[in-house]
Amino acid sequence: MGGGNLNIEEIIEKVANGEIKFYQVEKYVNGDKRLATEIRRKALEKRLGIKLHHIGYYSIDPNELIGRNIENMIGVVQIPMGVAGPLKINGEYAKGEFYIPLATTEGALVASVNRGCSALTEAGGVVTTLIDDKMTRAPLIRCPNARRAREVAKWVEENLDYLQEKAVSKVTRHGKLRGVKPFIVGNNLYLRFEFETGDAMGMNMVTIASEEIMKVIEEEFPDVRYLALSGNLCVDKKPNAVNFILGRGKTVIAEAVVPRKIVEKKLKTTPELIAEVNYFKNLVGSAQAGSYGFNAHFANIVGAIFLATGQDEAQITEGAHGITIAEVTPDGDLYISITMPSLEIGTVGGGTRVPSQREALEIMGVAGGGDPPGINAKKFAEIVAGAVLAGELSLLAAIAAKHLARAHKMLGR
């Protein structure tokens, strides 16, 4: 029985005809979120005259997700997940051989990344280097004029420790304010705060902390007005130049030297052709297109890993930013690298709590918080970068060998 005098069928009927809203269902079933999920789905089936059998088939517990990861839940969407690897990584945090979980419906993608992993591992592995690690939020403050905006910006730059103590430490144990980059446009001040966020991707953390900072600034400067918690200079979930240049999340590089014999044997092409394709496709072609993605397909690998591991899928946008370099070494081998300026990932919080996504993180040995905090997310970043390099190498080789269409005919239909 449901809440009040209604039985389950009556609740379904009332949801289907709109008398009970989707978000109200839990109130009628004593807070049972699994039952509420079933009712919403059955009501939708009834209203639309369809069956949602596969959406209703799942193992995760709605009671653990509703109110944290999802609202108005009706079930799940299942995405096939494959694994590529092993990939040998010689990183500062990721050391050893790793398998890469990839959730995708694009045929040939996993096979291509797997081929890249095989070639790179045979070549001795990938060297990964973490260049920077920060999450940003850029509130917007309205000032009387540009000079006042400059004064406020200077005060903020000189009082980061004070703001950490009076604002940030009040709302987070893991967040650390490490810097700020002010932008002034007319009488508008955009403060691009930079935070350390441990193993969390950190958007919730830095958003809450930034709001506390705004309260302190308004107390210090009564003539300015905090207008928006995000002034779009963060920049979150949009293609942009700021993240490409200054970075956001993890800035990471993966590189390798692949001997000529491996390029010819495994990849069926030459270092010269791969370098030529990369230059005229990824660099010249991308420049002509006005793209921030000077690469072949970062987004394919980033997207598949994000979906598998519970990352914020909208941040695939920034993960697609980056540059691939390929050149022939003096010895005639292939040097190849990828630079990712804004890889926004975490191993705790958000979708990483979903059991299947947590298991995908466990495949790489990065589930949950690290000791010390932050080490798991850094390791994860190096693994992602290595996988992206594998994907770039394989696709560039396929294009150079004119095998791309053939591969998609075989595996992608």
UniProtKB/Swiss-Prot annotation:
Pfam families reported in the protein's UniProt record: HMG-CoA_red (PF00368)
The processes (GO biological process) annotated in the record are: coenzyme A metabolic process; isoprenoid biosynthetic process; sterol biosynthetic process
Q: Which reaction does it catalyse?
A: (R)-mevalonate + 2 NADP(+) + CoA = (3S)-3-hydroxy-3-methylglutaryl-CoA + 2 NADPH + 2 H(+)
**PROSITE patterns found in the cross-reference section:** HMG_COA_REDUCTASE_1, HMG_COA_REDUCTASE_2, HMG_COA_REDUCTASE_4
Q: Which InterPro entries match?
A: HMG_CoA_Rdtase, HMG_CoA_Rdtase_cat_sf, HMG_CoA_Rdtase_CS, HMG_CoA_Rdtase_eu_arc, HMG_CoA_Rdtase_N, HMG_CoA_Rdtase_NAD(P)-bd_sf, HMG_CoA_Rdtase_sub-bd_dom_sf
Q: Which UniProt keywords apply?
A: Isoprene biosynthesis, NADP, Oxidoreductase
Q: Where is the active site?
A: 106 (charge relay system), 312 (charge relay system), 408 (proton donor)
Enzyme Commission number, as recorded: 1.1.1.34
- EC primary class: oxidoreductase
Q: Which family does it belong to?
A: Belongs to the HMG-CoA reductase family.
**What is the recorded function of this protein according to its Swiss-Prot or TrEMBL entry?**
Converts HMG-CoA to mevalonate.
Give the PANTHER family listed for this entry. Answer: 3-HYDROXY-3-METHYLGLUTARYL-COENZYME A REDUCTASE (PTHR10572:SF24)
Provide the protein name.
3-hydroxy-3-methylglutaryl-coenzyme A reductase
Q: Which organism is it from?
A: Pyrococcus horikoshii (strain ATCC 700860 / DSM 12428 / JCM 9974 / NBRC 100139 / OT-3)
UniProt lineage = Archaea, Methanobacteriati, Methanobacteriota, Thermococci, Thermococcales
What would be the name of the gene that encodes this protein?
Answer: hmgA
